[in-house]
Amino acid sequence: MNSERAYWLAWSQIRGVGPVLLKRIAQHFELLENAWKATAIALSEVDGLGGKLVHQILEQRPTINPANLLDHHQQKNPHFWTPADPEYPLLLWEIPSPPPVLYYLGQVDLADNQGQIPGIGIVGTRYPTEHGSRWTRKISQALAQQQFTVISGLAAGIDAVAHSSCLRAQGRTIAVLGTGLDLIYPPQNKALFEQIATEGLILSEYAAGTKPDRGNFPARNRIIAGLSRAVLVMEAPPKSGALITAKYANDFNRDVFTLPNSPDVKEAHGCLNLIHNGAEIILSEQQLLESLGAIPPVAPEDQPNRSDAKPPNVPNPAQPTPPPMDLDPTLQTLLQTLTSESTSLDQIVSKSGIATGQVSAGLLQLELLGLVSQQPGMRYQRT
């Protein structure tokens, strides 16, 4: 048994310790088993753990047996990850408030979890206009065709359109719920829920039996933003929950894109405010894909013969250090393509001769390894 799983689960039951504080505790003690056995003095060294909360923790710990809790929990919730599990999504662990327990249902793709396939969040109002629905269909299908994973919340409206359009294009989609995985909410999305469970993946930080609650959905939105490389707000009135997702995306250093519409349309007011505050505008599928790092495929007759291609004659200001030998060949090639100077994604694709989808995924992996940094305008450089 992975004992750390039991301690993540046990700590998640401690009242007063939320995801932000629990991540700090985990980082301070390295192992939550150590934290579980820590003295009051040791616990008080964690930023945010005051005397009153430390006292509450010490009172609650004897009432919880981590091993027994894990055994009992797995009977009702057999499929879940904690940050102690290698399958836990890497991008989600990066955020300040990673869920201590993440339940899943459906088809797990470890390439998603490891950040090798870029995920794009699509969110919006439950009551979209024809304009919003039409553009959501177009964008979701275009993303699916370029091998992006579409991530949304399975709500009525924009979420449902995004999921279903992605599936129609035979793409991969992930739904993040604000309930337990044994409850379908809203009920009218039952068929879509079942299709995603068969062909995609459904996630929730809430255990089986958790019913819809007003406070669950803003918390759910941080997971959508955390899993996503970028978030697209397709339509949002001023108080839409989609704007909460956009705020989380900004906080997590994710790109935010939004669809413009007339100021006369109330469903556009939130989007127009995002544009005013610096969100990127969605002008077309092609423009969006280029911004995200995937350009439309070249027709077969226009494909260059890459075996005959020669590298461009460009200055070589400094010889980059050799890449680590344990990187796979694609990552080695990408790293050798980059220098300390900022390079656009299109240039990286051209120089490396690697397909755009692989380039985007590879750059994300290199970012996670700390070998590459992303600059504004989808430009990259070696660190």
Q: Each predicted region: which residue ranges?
A:
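Short, small/acidic-rich helices and loops at N termini and domain boundaries
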Residues: 1-87, 345, 369-371, 376-383
